[in-house]
Amino acid sequence: MSFAGLLDFARKDVDLPQNSPNELLKDLHANFINQYEKNKNSYHYIMAEHLRVSGIYWCVNAMDLSKQLERMSTEEIVNYVLGCRNTDGGYGPAPGHDSHLLHTLCAVQTLIIFNSIEKADADTISEYVKGLQQEDGSFCGDLSGEVDTRFTLCSLATCHLLGRLSTLNIDSAVRFLMRCYNTDGGFGTRPGSESHSGQIYCCVGALAIAGRLDEIDRDRTAEWLAFRQCDSGGLNGRPEKLPDVCYSWWVLASLAILGRLNFIDSDAMKKFIYACQDDETGGFADRPGDCADPFHTVFGIAALSLFGDDTLESVDPIFCMTKRCLGDKQVEMYY
Amino acid sequence: MSDSDIPSSTLYKDNVDWKDITPIYPSKEEEVAVKIAVTEDFTDAFAYFRAILIKNEKSDRVMALLEDCIRLNPANYTVWQYRRVCLTELGWDLKKEMRYLSDIIQESPKNYQVWHHRRFIVETIGESAVNDELHFCSEVIRDENKNYHAWQHRQWVVRTFKVPLEKELTFALHMLLLDNRNNSAYNYRYFLMTLYDKTEDASQLDIEINLAKKFIENIPNNESAWNYLAGLLITNGVTSNSDVVSFVEDLYETTPEEKRSPFLLAFIADMMLENIENQKSAEESAGRAKKLYKDLQSIDPVRVNYYRHQSLLAQTMLIKAQTKVTAK
C-alpha cells in the first residue's frame, strides 16, 4: 500500500468538543446582537464603515429571524440606511461612500424588514442596478468594474424585491450565469472559476428569481452540495476545506431552492451548528471554539430556521429574510 | 526598538504636514445608528481620507495616507478606487506599486479589492508584466494551494496575454503532484482545455483521463479526482469510454470490500443509472445500482438520505425504461 493510501480516509474535518452547546441558545444570541457595540475590538471589523450597511442587515435580520426585531431602534436604523443613498441611485456602505450592489441589496432588504421600503425610490435604484449590467449579461459590483456572479444575485434580488425585475436584461444575465456552470454541477465567480458553495447559492438563487432553474441539472448540482457535508455534520465550501457555519447557510439554502434539502443529515448538521455557539457571550463562530461574530450568527440562525425550528421565524432560502416580512415578494418555485 | 524611537504621536491630526486639512469625523447620527468601536488611528486616518475625497487632492502625501487606510482596512473599496485615480494622474511608478501590492497580498490573500487593483496595474503595464505575474501567482498558490483569488487571477493573466497551454498544464500538474486532492488545480486544467478549445480533443481528453485514473489509483478516496473524471466524460456519459469502465470495474474487484471508497461506489452507481437510461441490461443495472446505494448508506452514513433518493431514482428509471420497451 502506498503512503498516500494510508491517508486514504483522512478527509479534512473538525472535532466537536464534548462540552459543546447542544441546543439553540436563542436569547443569548439576541443579547449578543443587541449589545455588540459594547464588546470592543473583537468584531469591530465586521461593522467597520466599509461594510456597515451589510452589517446592519446581518444584525437586523438575525433579530427578525429570532422574533426580536422590536429590540432594534427602527427609526434610527432606517434613517441611517436612507442616508447611505447616493445621487447615482445606489447605496454605499456608509454615508459619503460610493455605491455598491452589495450594499444596495442590503439597504433594500433592511428597509423591507422594517416595512419602510416605500421610503426608497424603486425607479432610481433599479436604474442604478441596470447601469451595472455588462454586455455579456454579467454585473459589476460598482464602477471599479469587478465582475462576480455574486453581483448577479444582488442585482436580480434587488430588482425583484422592488418589483422592477423587467428593468434588467434577464436573458443575457442567465446566459452569463450558465457560462459559469461547471462540469461538476457547481458554479464559480466567473466563467472558468472553480465551483464554490457560496457562488452556487448566488447562481441558483438568481436562476430561481429569473424562473430559469430548468437550465441546470438539479441532481448534479445537489449531489455536489450533498458531498459538502463532513462527518462532523458541518458543511464546507469546496472539497477538502474545513466546515464553516456560513457554508451551512449557502449549501442548505441552495439545496432548499433545488428542492433537495433532505440530502443533508439534519441532526448531524444541527449538532455542528449548535456547537459553534458561544455559550457565554452568545453569537455563532465559524467553527467550534472560535470567536463569535454577527455574520456567522445570522447565517447560523438562518440555517437552523430552514430546518423548521419553531422558536424561529421561517426563512426564505433565496433572500435570507423572514417569509413573514417578504409576504407576496416570495418567489414561487416548482420542483 | 526603544520607546524614544517612536514619535510621540503618529496621528495625522498631530502632523504638521497635514495642518492645512480639516478632518471630517463621522457625524453624531452615524455614531448613534450603529455604534462601533474603532481604534484612534483608524478614526484619525479615515477622517483625513474623507476630507481628501472632498478636496479631491492627488499627491504623494495622499498616496501615503491611502496606504495607511489600506493597512487599517484593506477591504475598503473606496480607498482602492481613489488610489487608482491618483496612480493615473500622478504617473506613479507601477513597478513600485506592484511590490507594494505583493506585500499586502501576502498579508491578506483573501481580499477581493487587492486582487482587483493588481489586475488594473498589470493591464496598465501590459505584456512585460506577465512573467512576474505568473511567478507571483505561483508563490501565493504554493503558500495556500486552493487560494481562489490567485487561481482566478492566473486564469485572467493566461487568458488576457495568451500564455502557452503546455507551460500552464505543467504548472497545474506540478500542483496536483504536490496535492492529489487539490480541486483548484483540476479546475484549472479544465479551464485551460476550454480556453484552448481542447474539451472535445481526443488526445487531450485521453491525457486528462489517464491523469485522473493515476491520481485515483494513488488515493481512491479523492472526491476531486472522481469529479474530474466524470466531468471529462460529461458529453457522452460515464459509460462512454470503455477504458474508464474497465478501470473502474477492476478497481472495484481488486479493492477489499472494507477499503472501497464511497466515490468509487457512487461512480459505478452512476454508470448503472446510465445503463438503465440507455436500456442496457436495465433490470440488472437497476439491481446493482440499488445494491451499491445500500452499501453506500452504511459506509457513508452522513449522506444516507441522498443515497435513498438515488435508489428510488434507479427504480423510477427502470420502470420508465420497461414501459418504454412495452410500448414498442
UniProtKB/Swiss-Prot annotation, chain A:
Subunit structure: Heterodimer of an alpha and a beta subunit.
Protein name: Probable geranylgeranyl transferase type-2 subunit beta
Encoding gene per record: ggtb-1
Pfam families the record matches: Prenyltrans
Annotated function: Catalyzes the transfer of a geranyl-geranyl moiety from geranyl-geranyl pyrophosphate to both cysteines in Rab proteins with an -XXCC, -XCXC and -CCXX C-terminal.
Organism per entry: Caenorhabditis elegans
Record-listed E.C. numbers: 2.5.1.60
Enzymatic reactions: geranylgeranyl diphosphate + L-cysteinyl-[protein] = S-geranylgeranyl-L-cysteinyl-[protein] + diphosphate
Keywords: Metal-binding, Prenyltransferase, Repeat, Transferase, Zinc
Residues bound to geranylgeranyl diphosphate: 196-198, 238-250
Annotated PFTB repeat ranges: 74-115, 122-163, 170-211, 218-259, 266-312
InterPro entries: PGGT1B-like, Prenyltrans, Ptb1, Terpenoid_cyclase/PrenylTrfase
One function term, GO molecular function aspect: Rab geranylgeranyltransferase activity
Cofactor note: Binds 1 zinc ion per subunit.
Positions contributing to Zn(2+) binding: 244, 246, 296
Cofactor(s) annotated in UniProt: Zn(2+)
Protein family: Belongs to the protein prenyltransferase subunit beta family.
Superkingdom of origin organism: Eukaryota
Gene Ontology annotations for the cellular component aspect, listed alphabetically: Rab-protein geranylgeranyltransferase complex
Single GO biological process annotation from the record: protein geranylgeranylation
